[in-house]
């Protein structure tokens, strides 16, 4: 894992935890769990440590099944942010273009993923300077809040990860609001 500031680290770790738990993903769990212990902000560190404990204590197949039920089989809690509350596909297309522009403005392009995929957005915010990260997270904040509310409603532990993201976003917005 690259050297980052604490909020960047939080964003990378939450991005990782929102990724599909493939065989390669499981191979990185211990390294990422160790990185969670070095997160500077105590509340974020505690949430990440507890989530990694949950992951490490889970049976991989059961964890994968729960992940798929939470994100792949649920329209309400999937990780593609423009699909929530969307019946106007023209508006969804406009949102996708706006998300794509966030990546292009930062010098990145996505070849194999849609630009509204939450882990990709979190990785992008972790890879750019704080001011741009604050802008990216502010642009997606309403969608993050909606997803968080739906995860809470569904009683899914991933809601705690969005708490980490949203408090990190608020912190970045406060630091860059000059």
Model-inferred region functions:
Residues 1-110, 114-116, 123-178:
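Charged, alpha-helix-forming regions
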């Amino acid at each position: 894992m690259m050297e980052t500031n604490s909020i960047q680290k939080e964003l990378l770790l939450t991005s990782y935890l929102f990724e599909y738990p493939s065989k390669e993903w499981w191979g990185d769990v211990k390294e990422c769990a160790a990185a969670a212990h070095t997160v500077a902000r105590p509340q974020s560190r505690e949430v990440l440590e507890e989530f990694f404990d949950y992951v490490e204590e889970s049976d991989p197949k059961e964890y994968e099944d729960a992940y798929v039920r939470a994100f792949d089989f649920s329209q309400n809690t999937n990780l593609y942010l423009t699909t929530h509350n969307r019946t106007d596909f023209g508006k969804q297309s406009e949102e996708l273009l706006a998300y794509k522009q966030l990546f292009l403005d930062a010098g990145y392009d996505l070849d194999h993923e849609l630009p509204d995929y939450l882990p990709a957005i979190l990785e992008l915010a972790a890879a750019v300077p704080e001011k741009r990260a604050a802008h990216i997270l502010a642009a997606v904040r309403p969608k993050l809040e909606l997803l968080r509310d739906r995860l809470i409603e569904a009683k899914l532990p991933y809601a705690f990860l969005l708490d980490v993201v949203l408090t990190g976003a608020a912190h970045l917005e406060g630091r860059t609001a000059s």
